[in-house]
Amino acid sequence: MDLPPPWGRAWAGRLHEHAFDSQALTGNPLSDSHVRPLYVYTPPGYDDEPHRRYPSVWVIQGMTGQVDMWRNRKAFSPSVLESIDAWFADGHPPAIVVYVDAWTSYGGSQFLDSPGTGRYHTYLCDELVPFVDEHYRTLPDAAHRGIAGKSSGGYGAMVTPILRPDLFGGLATHAGDALFEICYQPEFPQAARALRDEYDGSFDAFWADFRARPGRPKRSDPALVNEYAMAACYSTDADGTIRLPFDVGTGQLIPDVWDRWLAWDPVRMASSRADALRGLRAIWIDAGRSDEYFLDLGAEAFRRALASVGVDDDRVRFELFDGAHGGIEWRYPEAIGWLAERLAP
């Protein structure tokens, strides 16, 4: 017996689930699993038109997210998976939508290759993209492939096309990490104070405590988890040593390490990757006006960086909406639908 809404909903398209065995993630420094879930959504009509090919939109998650988060319903709203299916069921231009898992034991990977976390950029670009193109009827070129995400996923949605314009021709970033001195630096004193008062200045002591109390958070956890995870992605030495960008005793910046972080800021990357950005067919940028990490300011800075390198205004959709950092899943269907339309043949 099928359950009625909200517990069950009839799908117009289909969701295909895979367990992907990644060679790139095998032997990663955190010993995280190299077998990862992968969801591929095919839109209504996919099975009825066996020769038709579709643009694809890749959806990547924020910090601490795993791919099954897209199944989560709220009391008065469907899941993201269901919302996107409903969007295409309404007759909007169709696309294949791919949901990627790039979680790590530190919470995330920023979708980069790093000796601190593993080769998540390679995994996404050089393993998953060819796999999906081989097994589904995508339009297998950058002009018809986009990527979307929120927060750290929004960061990945910005930097992945910058690094691989041969693979991605469009992006949608919702409150993506950008303008690092605004979104990250305010947490450095908080993290330093928490380390001093609770862990004798030791991140190792924090991690031991954090992992010993699953589901029992402390107020200081978010800043400590976030900054250490980011350091693992942005400023890990080749031997695996994670370098923090601030002094754990004072919270003051360590300039040479901080410069390594800034080199990964999408706002700053724009000037050296101008050709890649000018080649994108569609760029969606949004954020809530009350974002707790000031990513509305980062969104504006990224928009201005695009303009400064000559990205055509008609390729960019920019919006600041009433909202904060959380609870903005309602932005996904329209943004993914916009990419699907812009990336269609």
Which residues are covered by each model-predicted region?
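Non-catalytic cap/lid and distal C-terminal segments of serine-dependent acyl enzymes
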Residues: 1-345
